[in-house]
Amino acid sequence: DTVQNTTIPIVIPANGSLVAKRRVELYAEVQGIFQTSGKLFKPGQKYRGGETLIRIDAAEYYAGVQSAKSNLYNAIAAIMPDLRLDFPEVFQKWQTYLNNFDLNKTTPTLPELTSDKEKYFITGRGIVSNYYTVKNQEQRLAKYNIRAPFSGILTEALVTEGSLVRNGQKLG
């Protein structure tokens, strides 16, 4: 007899439960009505990384964010005549900022404050405070859409579409 080396597959029959290698629990950080997002939010549903799991109605909060952006825009527009007279060297960068300001996009970073006089003037008019209020609200607005951190399968769903979701509530 001749012996030959070959690969023999090893099969191990096993019974038991699988435990996910990566598992996260979903909690709401905002309150609102759970809206449809294209896929049913049910156990067994597959999601790709970055795909929307849950959309919470943000219409009211969005209106507040837009109002804050408008207030920031108006505050900057109100100081433009003073900038033209008292700070002609920085007027153009603020004019460019206003021209590029779009209420339907993320608020752009404020121009760099180059001198102490400019810094005191801009800060004294509440521009910096308004800017950070808007940025804070934009960050919170993003929490109305909960996205899958990685590809996987939903194993638990504790809310249904159309129900009220409360801040801190476990979703799945």
Predicted regions and their residues:
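Active-site-adjacent helical/loop segments in soluble small-molecule enzymes
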Residues: 16
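Terminal hydrophobic membrane-targeting helix
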Residues: 6-9, 23
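Conserved phosphate/oxyanion-binding catalytic-loop motifs
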Residues: 28
